[in-house]
Amino acid sequence: MSQLAEKSCVTPADAAAPIPFDNTYARMPEAFYERVKPAAVAAPRLLRVNDALARQLRIDPAFLKSPQGVAVLSGNEIAPGSDPIAQAYAGHQFGSFVPQLGDGRAILLGEVVDAAGKRFDIQLKGSGRTRFSRRGDGRAAIGPVIREYIVSEAMAALGIPTTRSLAVVLTGEQVMRERVLPGGILTRVASSHLRVGTFQYFAARGDVENLRALADYAIARHYPDVCSAGDPYLAFFDAVVATLARLSARWMLVGFIHGVLNTDNTAIAGETIDYGPCAFIDAYRPDKVFSSIDQFGRYAFENQPAAVAWNLARFAEALLPLIADGGAKAIECANASIAAFDDHFNAAYLSGMRRKLGLVREMEGDLELASDLLTRMSENGADFTLTFRALCGAADDTKGDAEVRGLFADPSAFDQWTERWRQRLSLEGQSAEVRRTDMLSVNPMFIPRNHRIEAAIRDAEAGRFETFHELVEVLSHPFDDQPKFAGYAKPPRPEEEVRQTFCGT
């Protein structure tokens, strides 16, 4: 099995470069990518740099804000040590297989290793055409760019595994979508951009040699502990199943709807990736769909765990030639691994839901207690985020009931549930102060409300960016009360409600 370190092309001189690139994926066979330079833009202007993330990656934020840094972030200049490529992958899109997708408007500049020794990709999104662009122009409008910046950084602040956003650049050019819009480029950071669809790309071609090379690379980079397993490829699959089950549970605990859970948007590192038509639930409805292209609700909120499990089954199909005998035994092993998804998901979900309800001890009936609350919320139009936040003040003080009751169309529905909840809380050994502190740490006050994101996008399209910057700052502290910004916690008024979201590609 190949080792990641053997593929590194870093030299001592690279360490002093403004961006300390240490590239490995670009040393894989050329079937994995196309070498391509970003397309230059007319008048790049820096909109935002994520200073904290830059420092984590051992990049001086001052460089990124300099003329040379802006030139690199806009694709107008190639930084020393960068080896730009567009990655190849395939994917199932809404259940239909497409044998070649790939980075049609994104270019991987290279990789860096952070201060803790963890490797990250640095990628430009909206940086021009590649051979995978099909009929696209390779560009991005400012709306999808700032949407991904807002939501990915909010997810990180919520503690949910996610790709990150390092910078946003305005291109000074216009892009044509349903109307003419200002262009932008996002600098995305990810543990990697290896997707289920990356494995499907080689499996669909019967290219077992490169499939094995890809699996070896992924194991060395993300799951090195499985190298010593009797069947490392099966152990690799088991690890990805567990990781993605836990990730999907985290989504369900904050009311996040990805919107386009295709296999090419499923990262094997277990990070949330590709935020196109994503949204957060306001009033709780388990069947909620926002994405304009999800006409049949395939990726509705309640369907997300099943969608991820389906994607993992496709991942298993791609890996079959590497597992066991590659035949009947491999299928048997893969099926057993997929069957474990529900156990991983249920354990993570119930553990998270217990904390949201102030429960520490594991007791029978806890899942039913949580499910009953969600049913009552759905029937009474209760806001998902605000209900759980308000419970923090009601767990040990009935004076807090009024705030929760006010979120229910029929307050008696909450009254009936809260009797059971308080009875269950009485079996805990925590002090009220400890319980409240713990609940406040997992039940956010602030999420990226859809109407707030849309307001930031509208302002940005008009050349006003204050809303974007303020929203990013508020969402960086989602568990703090922030009285000055209390309005950001409120659900939309009827005229503000966002009913559909769009990819914007």
Curated annotation (Swiss-Prot):
Cofactors, names only: Mg(2+); Mn(2+)
UniProt-listed InterPro entries: SelO
The UniProt record lists the keyword Magnesium: yes
Residues binding ATP, per UniProt: 102, 104-105, 125, 137-138, 188, 195, 274
Record EC number: 2.7.7.-, 2.7.7.108
Keywords, sorted A to Z: ATP-binding, Magnesium, Manganese, Metal-binding, Nucleotide-binding, Nucleotidyltransferase, Transferase
One of the Pfam families matching this protein, by short name: SelO
Amino acids binding Mg(2+): 265, 274
Highest taxon of source: Bacteria
Active site positions: 264 (proton acceptor)
Keyword set includes Ribosomal protein: no
Signal peptide: none
GO molecular function, one term: AMPylase activity
Catalytic activities: L-seryl-[protein] + ATP = 3-O-(5'-adenylyl)-L-seryl-[protein] + diphosphate; L-threonyl-[protein] + ATP = 3-O-(5'-adenylyl)-L-threonyl-[protein] + diphosphate; L-tyrosyl-[protein] + ATP = O-(5'-adenylyl)-L-tyrosyl-[protein] + diphosphate; L-histidyl-[protein] + UTP = N(tele)-(5'-uridylyl)-L-histidyl-[protein] + diphosphate
Biological function: Nucleotidyltransferase involved in the post-translational modification of proteins. It can catalyze the addition of adenosine monophosphate (AMP) or uridine monophosphate (UMP) to a protein, resulting in modifications known as AMPylation and UMPylation.
Family named by the database record: Belongs to the SELO family.
NCBIfam families assigned to the protein according to its UniProt record, in alphabetical order: PRK00029.1 (NF000658)
Name under which the protein is recorded: Protein nucleotidyltransferase YdiU
